[in-house]
Amino acid sequence: MQLSDVRRAFQADLPTVVIVTLNAPRASDSPFAAPVAPPRLMADCNANVVAAMKEFGVRKTVILQAFGVGDSWVNLHCVLRLLMKTSNMSYQYDDHNETEREVRASGVDYVMVRPSRLVETEDATLPIKVWPDHGKGVPLMASTSRLSVARWLVDAAEGTEWDNSAPVITN
């Protein structure tokens, strides 16, 4: 995503908040598959979003990340940390961490949500538990429905309760 593309999108319909749900693609759906995206896909795209936000006076971005990024790394179960460090998933975690560092330093308001293991469900009534940025206490097999994540992203965009934080969420 080039800065010129983001500018065109902003010119067409100026947002008040930007929600970013990028994920770096892999060669297959397997989490162990080789990455096919540039190493900084998410960081560079978010940098372009932040640059356009500053140009157009947009103050807030809400970014989908993953449990284990940033401060939550130390509270990710040790088996999962080993998996994330030694598999091809490490590239995405590196990219997420670069995104976090750069967005935090940019001066824009942000919410970086870190759901635990994503699952499919049609149940729109599942409660969402919000954990602190460090994710201390999140159970090993905790999961978050994609539907819950989508709902939470919109709620975070519309409110201010989670501004300038990076909470972990689960169902």
Q: What is each PLM-predicted segment?
A:
Residues 25, 38-39, 55-56, 60, ...:
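Oxidoreductase cofactor-interface core, primarily capturing Rossmann-like NAD(P)-dependent enzymes
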